[in-house]
């Protein structure tokens, strides 16, 4: 009971930190806002300068929160579905497949803009299915599976590079220049995906069982692995439709959360949601304040942090095999 209460207290503290970071991100920038500016705006209702800043910063902050949460949860789900601690949507090519589909849809059927998360999901499924089919045939270990995923990532990024030579082929570049319609589109996918994940979370712990143990208790492990994998691909692909590829968030957060609160998915999913949202928000905030008025993409900061972590996890995986 004491441990459970400590986890609840930690979760509340993380929520407070997240809200405080969101406020700091909102008032920080080339044009700074004071508390008095916000107070005047919300009491009088008229302040054109504040209104313009709200329309520039608030969509960006909300999208950072949703994308961070979705990618962190997607990483946790992929690791559960594939039973691979190194799995992450960007590394195994899911994000690249989703981005190619997104780019093609915007070129040929731009009128379906509001359906981009769903269309990107179709593109993200292709590399995921290839990984599953190859794994079922060759039974890769954790590192070999990631190497196959990296090969798919390189292949699909090559295709994407060719496609983007067309000046009409536009792909999203991070969190900059986001508008309210982007928030609305992503919010639908975020709510749907995260609610389904919370409903599924009691079953996720059973994915650690082997096939014989699962069948002995009447648990259809293959069905839930597929459901978990598809949900992970959906969450990651929906973010790609709005912000493009963001690396390593799906690796960093689940491993940090496991160190903090253990591997119980009922606890891991909510904590991953909050910490993922906070981490991307911090990366975006740092990118805006390190060298103003220039902006460093949040993805660059995540790669600087995530690259060494991936190397560490690969070394740890190899050590465990010895």
Swiss-Prot record:
Its main location: membrane. GO terms for cellular component: plasma membrane. Disulfide bonds: none annotated. InterPro entries: ABC_BtuC-like, ABC_transptr_permease_BtuC. CDD domains: TM_ABC_iron-siderophores_like. Gene3D superfamilies: ABC transporter involved in vitamin B12 uptake, BtuC. Part of the binding-protein-dependent transport system for heme-iron. Responsible for the translocation of the substrate across the membrane. This is Probable heme-iron transport system permease protein IsdF. It comes from Staphylococcus aureus (strain N315).
């Amino acid at each position: 009971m004491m441990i459970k209460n400590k986890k609840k207290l930690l979760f509340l503290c993380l929520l407070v930190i997240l809200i405080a970071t969101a406020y700091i991100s909102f008032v920080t920038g080339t044009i700074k806002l004071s508390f008095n500016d916000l107070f005047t705006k919300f009491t009088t209702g008229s302040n054109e300068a504040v209104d313009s800043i709200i329309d520039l910063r608030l969509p960006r902050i909300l999208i950072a929160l949703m994308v961070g949460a979705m990618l962190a949860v997607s990483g946790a789900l992929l690791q559960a579905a594939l039973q691979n601690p190194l799995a992450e949507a960007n590394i195994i090519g899911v994000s690249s497949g989703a981005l190619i589909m997104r780019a093609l849809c915007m070129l040929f059927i731009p009128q379906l803009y509001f359906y981009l998360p769903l269309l990107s999901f179709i593109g993200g499924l292709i590399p995921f299915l290839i990984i599953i089919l190859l794994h079922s045939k060759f039974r890769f270990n954790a590192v070999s599976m990631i190497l196959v995923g990296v090969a798919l990532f390189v292949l699909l990024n090559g295709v994407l590079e060719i496609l983007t030579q067309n000046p009409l082929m536009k792909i999203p570049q991070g969190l900059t220049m986001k508008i309210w319609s982007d928030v609305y589109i992503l919010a639908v996918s975020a709510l749907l995906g995260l609610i389904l994940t919370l409903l599924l979370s009691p079953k996720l712990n059973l994915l650690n069982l082997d096939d014989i143990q699962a069948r002995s208790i009447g648990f259809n492990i293959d069905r839930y692995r597929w459901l978990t994998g598809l949900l992970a691909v959906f969450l990651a692909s929906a973010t790609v439709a709005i912000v493009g590829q963001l690396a390593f968030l799906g690796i960093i957060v689940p491993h940090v959360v496991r160190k903090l609160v253990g591997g119980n998915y009922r606890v891991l999913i909510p904590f991953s949601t909050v910490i993922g949202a906070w981490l991307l928000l911090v990366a975006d905030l740092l990118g805006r304040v390190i060298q103003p008025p220039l902006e460093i993409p949040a993805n660059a900061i995540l790669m600087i942090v995530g690259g060494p972590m991936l190397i560490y996890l690969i070394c740890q995986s190899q050590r465990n095999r010895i």
